[in-house]
């Protein structure tokens, strides 16, 4: 079954294209709570460039509250290390502009400017489950 599911679209954009459904008409359930995502949550999922999950030929996304809980759970259970931004490029051997960093709280993909802001403001970067995280412009103020 997994092999067959590997052929299904993994992004919202690919899903809409593959099944010829406008984003505004798309209805997907959350993989965790099974409630339908609101239009705003689906748009946020799309903008964050997160991957869809296929289970038994059904497609799921993740609602905003469950996404935040997932980020918290992963940070509490899969934290590996943290470092200051000044050493991140040396540590990873990847230019900051190419390094994928998601928000520690909401899993938004940080822009290059947000990564620079994290460094300037002295924020830490955290390695969680093999992926780097820090804070996006919306969560850093909370």
Curated annotation (Swiss-Prot):
From the Swiss-Prot or TrEMBL record, state where the protein is found: Host cytoplasm; Host nucleus
**What cellular component terms from Gene Ontology apply here?**
host cell cytoplasm; host cell nucleus
Pfam families, alphabetized: E6 (PF00518)
Superkingdom of the source species = Viruses
Residues in unnamed zinc fingers run 30-66, 103-139
Q: Which InterPro entries match?
A: E6, E6_sf
The Gene Ontology biological process terms listed for this entry are:
DNA-templated transcription; regulation of DNA-templated transcription; symbiont-mediated perturbation of host apoptosis; symbiont-mediated perturbation of host ubiquitin-like protein modification; symbiont-mediated suppression of host innate immune response; symbiont-mediated suppression of host type I interferon-mediated signaling pathway
User: What keywords would UniProt list here?
Assistant: Activator, DNA-binding, Early protein, Host cytoplasm, Host nucleus, Host-virus interaction, Inhibition of host innate immune response by virus, Metal-binding, Modulation of host cell apoptosis by virus, Transcription, Transcription regulation, Viral immunoevasion, Zinc, Zinc-finger
What's an example of a GO molecular-function annotation for this chain?
A: DNA binding
Function of the molecule:
Plays a major role in the induction and maintenance of cellular transformation. E6 associates with host UBE3A/E6-AP ubiquitin-protein ligase and modulates its activity. Protects host keratinocytes from apoptosis by mediating the degradation of host BAK1. May also inhibit host immune response.
Output the HAMAP family linked to this UniProt entry: HPV_E6 (MF_04006)
> Which family does the record claim for this protein?
Belongs to the papillomaviridae E6 protein family.
Question: What does the subunit section of this Swiss-Prot or TrEMBL entry state?
Answer: Forms homodimers. Interacts with ubiquitin-protein ligase UBE3A/E6-AP; this interaction stimulates UBE3A ubiquitin activity. Interacts with host BAK1.
Instruction: Name it.
Output: Protein E6
Q: Which organism is it from?
A: Human papillomavirus type 60
